[in-house]
Design a protein with these regions (language model features):
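A glycine-/small-polar-enriched, mobile loop at the entrance of the PLP active site in fold-type I
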Residues: 8-64, 68
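General beta-strand structural signal in soluble alpha/beta enzymes
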Residues: 11-13, 61-64, 87, 110-111, ...
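Active-site C-terminal subdomain of aminotransferase-like
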Residues: 18-19, 195-240
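Conserved beta-loop-alpha segment that forms the PLP phosphate-binding cup at the N-terminus of a helix
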Residues: 57-86, 90, 94-98
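Active-site-proximal loop->helix
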Residues: 96-107
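Active-site phosphate-binding strand-loop segment of PLP-dependent enzymes
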Residues: 119-176, 189, 197
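Conserved active-site segment immediately N-terminal to the catalytic lysine
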Residues: 183-195
Length: 240
């Protein structure tokens, strides 16, 4: 008998994180049919409780995707080709915002800070003022996994409001571990993932979007399907 079978490994990575035993036990059960009443009941209960995790009164959109999928959904719904978008990065996943914005054709201003340093909200504000026209959104990271730095999301939200633009925050590795009261701070979009501090299996990604962000997405003429927020919100309400 292979002794490796009985070795218990403990993950010390930023994600995926270790699963609580009761979660692992459920994962060993037979797969459920996603249209069955029992599954729908669990799904609806999860959707009902997710806003508490994000500290918001808004619905949380759920996708079968990696965290990067939910990040792409934010860019697909909010960025417009040729229109300004500002990215503030200080690590690998901040850079991903810039790559996404450029892929969708946004006129991207990428403010790159030294890895290991925090994003400077004042410089973000100066960059917005220098654009000469409103930015569609600021894209930033709460907890930069590549360095461990926690950015000042509250200050970035104040900058966004002062310049009448949206703030989109990747909180994939911080959500559930670092406080981020979305509604209280006025953060328009918070992106989350199941496999980090929430300690559940990989495969789910979330976008908690404010009414202002959803309105901006509804007016965006860009093409999208799976990551279309309006379609996803409608599906969650009407046919889970």
């Amino acid at each position: 008998m292979n002794p490796e079978i009985f070795n218990k490994q403990y993950l010390m990575t930023a994600g995926p994180t270790p699963l609580p035993p009761r979660v692992s036990q459920v994962m060993a059960e037979p797969i459920a049919y996603h249209r069955a009443p029992a599954f729908v009941e669990v799904y609806e209960r999860a959707l009902e409780r997710l806003p508490k995790v994000f500290q918001t009164a808004n619905d949380v959109l759920s996708f079968a995707a990696s965290g990067s999928g939910a990040m792409e959904s934010a860019v697909a719904n909010l960025a417009v080709p040729g229109e300004p978008a500002v990215v503030a990065s200080a690590g690998k996943f901040g850079q991903r915002w810039a790559e996404l914005c450029e892929a969708f054709g946004a006129d991207t201003t990428h403010l790159e800070f030294e890895w290991g340093e925090k994003v400077d909200p004042e410089r973000v504000g100066e960059s917005l003022a220098a654009l000469g026209r409103p930015a569609r959104a600021i894209f930033a990271t709460q907890s930069e996994t590549s360095t461990g730095v926690i950015n000042d999301v509250r200050a970035l939200a104040e900058v966004a409001r002062a310049h009448n633009t949206l703030l989109v925050v990747d909180a994939i590795s911080g959500l559930g571990a670092v406080d981020l009261p979305q509604d209280e701070w006025g953060v328009d979009v918070v992106i989350g993932g199941s496999q980090k501090s929430l300690m559940t299996p990989p495969g789910l990604a979330f976008a908690a979007a404010s009414e202002r962000a959803l309105a901006a997405a509804a007016e965006n003429p860009g093409r999208r399907y799976y990551f279309d927020w309006s379609r996803t919100a409608k599906g969650q309400r009407e046919q889970p």
